């Protein structure tokens, strides 16, 4: 496993990129972890298959690390997938799009956040994050055939109105964004949050197998079985 690399220059972006490979049947999950309070310790995931096709989920601020990794490993970026439209999960969209011209996908009810700095909460961070890349919207149950294994879209309105999870059934992997976090859940007091829809959204996740591996938008990975035991919200 390659050593974690940390910038030693105050002029460069402060980032720690974890090249920890998780082999799960037909796919490999590579977490890119951006450790900076300004970006709320957001996680980015690169998922690739045996044919060197890959997708990036929630590109945070580790722009060059993602680009370098994809180029160094001769990967073909098929798509940029967004679990929701908050600024800390979409900052890297334009950089990746300009580098690879990959399709961008987001939940239908979160599409407005890509072009609205209030809705995507970047104004709260004293910034104005806007995505210029073209994008397509996703609906519940939609299947994406981007990798060797299909990716299913599960809508989970709660943290935002258009939050979605990405589920790879054969590998039993779920990318939850800020819906489920390690031993907790995302906030429900931000613009477009739908707290009243939490239980209906959670019921979709609870229907998945207990051994489902969970990769959230912040924090460490977990499993649905563990979250059922220790997370008071996963009931």
Describe these PLM feature segments.
Residues 61-145, 230-233:
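Active-site HxH/HxHxD metal-binding segment of metal-dependent hydrolases
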Residues 25-73, 165-177:
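Conserved beta-strand hairpin/beta-sheet module of binuclear metal-dependent hydrolase folds
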Residues 15-16, 26:
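Generic short N-terminal amphipathic or hydrophobic helices
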Residues 41, 114-117, 184:
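Short, charged, surface-exposed secondary-structure boundary motifs
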Residues 120-123, 143, 150-235:
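Metallo-beta-lactamase
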Residues 56-57, 78-85, 104-107, 155-158, ...:
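Active-site neighborhood of phospho(di)ester-bond hydrolases with catalytic His/Asp-centered motifs
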Residues 2, 11-13, 19:
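Short, low-complexity intrinsically disordered segments enriched in A/P/G/S/L with frequent Arg
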């Amino acid at each position: 496993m390659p050593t974690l690399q940390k910038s030693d220059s105050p002029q460069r972006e402060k980032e720690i990129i974890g090249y920890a490979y998780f082999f799960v049947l037909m796919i490999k999950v590579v977490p890119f972890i951006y450790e900076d309070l300004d970006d709320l310790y957001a996680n980015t995931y690169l998922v690739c298959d045996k044919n060197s096709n890959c997708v990036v989920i929630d590109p945070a601020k580790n722009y060059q690390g993602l680009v370098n990794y994809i180029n160094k490993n001769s990967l073909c970026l098929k798509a940029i997938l967004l679990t929701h439209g908050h600024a800390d999960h979409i900052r890297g969209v334009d950089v990746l799009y300009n580098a690879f011209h990959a399709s961008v996908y987001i939940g239908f009810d979160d599409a407005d956040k890509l072009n609205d700095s209030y809705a995507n909460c970047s104004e709260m961070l004293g910034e104005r994050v806007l995505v210029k890349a073209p994008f397509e919207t996703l609906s519940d149950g939609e299947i994406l055939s981007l990798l060797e294994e299909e990716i299913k879209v599960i809508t989970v309105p709660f943290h935002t109105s258009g939050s979605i999870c990405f589920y790879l059934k054969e590998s039993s992997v779920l990318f939850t964004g800020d819906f489920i976090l390690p031993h907790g859940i995302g906030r429900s007091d931000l613009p477009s949050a739908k707290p009243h829809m939490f239980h209906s959204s959670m019921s979709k996740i609870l229907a998945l197998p207990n051994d489902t591996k969970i990769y959230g938008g912040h924090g460490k990975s977990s499993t649905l079985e563990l979250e059922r035991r220790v997370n008071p919200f996963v009931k």
